[in-house]
């Protein structure tokens, strides 16, 4: 009796799943640029993102762009003593994760998962490169249409 109830529950869930005839978008590349000020947090998040990609069966490449250092020099005193200054420094570390040849559904699931687990102090920029069909007016070679027009004007 319990097996029948479980089977009925599964059938109800299957009826709730909707499918669409709309084709899924294809992405040639998905670039994720992750920025942070703390190296340990960035390393940990990179490990998490790579592990999540491997679990989904995605091929991923990681490279580390050079860090950016911003320095600010300010006077210690507001009104006098120009000789006495203070320097502040902000170091921003970057990691670039690149995934290739993804479907739109897979990309959305992966991005939602890693964005929900984004730690504090880490920023993320996502760039999607979509694959699309050529428009009809570009598919036909241009030199064939130009030569046909020249023949019409000559006669």
UniProtKB/Swiss-Prot annotation:
Disulfide pattern: none
Keyword field: Mitochondrion, Ribonucleoprotein, Ribosomal protein
Cell compartment(s), UniProt: Mitochondrion
Superkingdom classification of source: Eukaryota
Entry GO CC: mitochondrial small ribosomal subunit; mitochondrion
Pfam family, one: Ribosomal_S10
Complex formation: Component of the mitochondrial ribosome small subunit (28S) which comprises a 12S rRNA and about 30 distinct proteins.
PANTHER family: MITOCHONDRIAL 28S RIBOSOMAL PROTEIN S10, SMALL RIBOSOMAL SUBUNIT PROTEIN US10M
Family the UniProt entry places it in: Belongs to the universal ribosomal protein uS10 family.
Protein name stated in the entry: Small ribosomal subunit protein uS10m
